[in-house]
Each structure stands twice: as C-alpha cells, then as structure tokens.
C-alpha cells in the first residue's frame, strides 16, 4: 500500500508539471508541444535582445548580397504565411514582423530569434553559393520561428527546474531516504541534460524538415539541400557526434533530408 501511495504521489507531481500550459501542434509535422511561455512574453524578451544585437552588429556593405538575403527571405515568409492562413493557422504568426539582415561576420552561420528576426552572416554565402541553397538555410531558420522552438526550449527548462524541486519534495514526503533522494535528483539532472540536448537535436531535425517544405512552397528546388549540406559538412571542423550535441550528424542530417524529399517535391512540383 505504501509503495502504491508513493507511486501515486510521484505520478501526480509529474502530471502537475506536464498538465499546465498551452498545447499546440507544430505546422507541417503535426507534433504536439506543451508551451508554458506565451508569444507575448517571449516576443517582448527576444525583441529587446535583437535590438541590442543589431545595434552592435555591422551590417554588410555588399548591397547585392544584402538585397538577395532580403528578397529570398521575404519570398519564403510570404509563402509560409499564405500556407498558414490557408490552413487556419495564421494566428500563430500574426504578431511576427519578418526581418532578414546580412551582417559582417566570417562565421558560417545564421540564426533566428522568435517573431521572425533572422540574421545571416556573410561568411555563410560562399557555402550557399546560390539563392536556392540560401532558401534552404532561411527556410530552416523560419521553421524555428514558426515551430516556436525557443518558447518550447524555455518551457522545458521550467519543467526541468521545477521537476528537480518536486522530486526532492515528493521523495521526502513519501518517506524515501535522503541518500536515495540525492541519488534520484542526480540521476534526473543527468537525464534532463541528455534529454534537453536530445530535444535540441530533435528541434534541429524538425527545422530541417519544415524548412525543406517551406523552401519548396516558395518555389525553390528542395533537391539542392543535399549538396548544400554536403558543402556545409566539408566546411565544418570535426565530424564526430556526441550525445550532448545540439545538431544531428552531417550524415544523419543528409539521410533525413533525402527521406523527406518526396514530400517536399510535391510542394515544389505544384508551383
């Protein structure tokens, strides 16, 4: 009976953590996600951080490249918004203000902040080489924004934080020894870190998937994604994988993209 009571308390605590927040579904993939952070909260925070970043960043002096980034970005954003509106999901990005900026930074990278603020480093362009490959990158970044990955990661951080506290409190209330409580807390800490990194890899894969579809929707040939990521693999340093890595391995990423290609081509051929 005592064991049953302990199990009930732990289960109730777990349900308390996952039962709050807003449940939504990610566009394209349909994956269910539970968000504890509202759009208003995260857009307010990220908007200020983006403003501070752009005040310090140096915009690219290459007018042609800057125009290309903005042109490809807006073409993608238009296609994405049209798709969301057609599927009754327009409210998900109603407060987004899409912005695409090229800055001087020789790193091979780009990043997205919530609300549609996307920054491309000019060091990425020698690897993208053409507009279609750039669309693959921007589609990936737009996917992070549309899928609300930042809000999801913040929500998961909250769950982990309170989960650690609840575990100790529940275990003590259930009569578990302090040694076992510490052991359980330590185990959850390791597990939480591994799960968080694994979830990040999952988000990156999801952004690859959604971004590929978005690029095809905008009329860019999604097949360029394979050769682009092969160039990215060659440009990156070190090819090893790790359980705590934030991104899928290059080989896994390319294999996944090839698996999604038939779906993407349906959108591309429909143009």
Each language-model region and where it sits:
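A Zn2+-metalloprotease active-site environment signal
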Residues: 3-9, 20-271
């Amino acid at each position: 009976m005592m064991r049953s009571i302990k199990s009930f308390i732990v289960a109730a605590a777990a349900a308390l953590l996952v039962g709050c927040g807003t449940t939504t579904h990610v566009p394209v993939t349909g994956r269910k996600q539970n968000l504890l952070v509202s759009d208003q909260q995260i857009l307010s925070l990220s908007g200020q951080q983006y403003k501070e970043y752009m005040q310090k960043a140096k915009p690219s002096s290459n007018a042609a490249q800057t125009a290309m980034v903005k042109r490809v970005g807006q073409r993608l954003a238009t296609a994405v918004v049209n798709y969301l509106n057609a599927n009754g999901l327009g409210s998900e990005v109603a407060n987004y203000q899409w912005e695409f900026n090229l800055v001087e930074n020789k790193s091979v990278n780009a990043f997205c902040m919530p609300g549609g603020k996307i920054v491309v480093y000019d060091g990425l362009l020698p690897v993208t080489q053409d507009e279609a490959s750039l669309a693959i990158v921007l589609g990936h970044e737009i996917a992070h924004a549309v899928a609300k990955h930042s809000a999801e990661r913040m929500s998961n951080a909250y769950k982990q934080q309170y989960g650690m506290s609840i575990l100790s409190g529940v275990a003590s209330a259930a009569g578990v020894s302090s040694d076992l409580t510490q052991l359980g807390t330590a185990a959850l800490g390791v597990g939480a870190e591994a799960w968080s990194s694994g979830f990040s890899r999952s988000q990156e894969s999801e952004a690859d998937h959604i971004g590929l579809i978005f690029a095809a929707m905008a009329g860019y040939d999604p097949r360029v994604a394979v050769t682009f990521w092969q160039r990215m693999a060659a440009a990156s340093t070190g090819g090893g994988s790790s359980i705590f890595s934030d991104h899928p391995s290059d080989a896994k990423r390319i294999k996944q993209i090839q698996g999604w290609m038939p779906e993407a081509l349906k959108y591309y051929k429909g143009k």
